[in-house]
Amino acid sequence: MGSTNYFIHDTSILDKNVGIGRGTKIWHFSHIQSGAIIGENCSLGQNVNVANNVKIGHHVKIQ
């Protein structure tokens, strides 16, 4: 995961210790909580909340 080749909208919140995979897009007003891991090439839509320590695989779309 350590790549910074992803997009996070300015209105989204990332807590400490999150992993974001390459090519992932996180859109408006989303919140990624501490310890969450998001795989590569994912799309997290508006207002998505990913709780603490949740793991999301590759190529997942959440709206």
Task: Identify the function of each model-found stretch.
Residues 2-9:
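Short gly/ser/thr-rich secondary-structure transition/capping motifs
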Residues 9-10, 15-16, 21-22, 27-28, ...:
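Left-handed beta-helix
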